């Protein structure tokens, strides 16, 4: 299922600026009393495909709202994801750089996690 999520061009932004954009998006659109751990941040090279994988394998996406920023390269995206994890967002498995993202995973995304799949 294709959703055509809007991806903001952040290729000219610094890591700090992108982290601030993501956190500000959380504060303005979400932040209904949940903790940041109720929100998932990740990186991908195909937003529609990754969101479908989350829906099928991980969790529902509340109101199908996903915010995304395209970074200059995978190193920037992975560092943004890492810093968001330090701020308290759920970033998944942290054993690998970019949590398994591939070399062209330049899109950082934010969503509110819904009910876990198979729960």
Where are these regions (language model features)?
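GIY-YIG nuclease catalytic motif and its immediate N-terminal context
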Residues: 1-91, 95-119
């Amino acid at each position: 299922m294709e959703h055509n999520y809007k991806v903001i061009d952040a290729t000219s932004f610094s890591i700090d600026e992108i982290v601030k954009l993501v956190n500000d998006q959380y504060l303005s659109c979400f932040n209904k009393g949940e903790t940041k751990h109720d929100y998932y941040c990740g990186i991908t090279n195909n937003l529609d495909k990754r969101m479908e994988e989350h829906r099928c394998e991980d969790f529902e996406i509340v109101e199908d709202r996903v915010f995304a920023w395209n970074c200059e390269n995978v190193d920037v995206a992975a560092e943004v994801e890492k810093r968001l994890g330090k701020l308290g967002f759920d970033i998944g498995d942290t054993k690998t750089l970019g949590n398994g993202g591939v070399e062209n995973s330049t899109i950082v995304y934010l969503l509110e996690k819904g009910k876990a799949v198979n729960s």
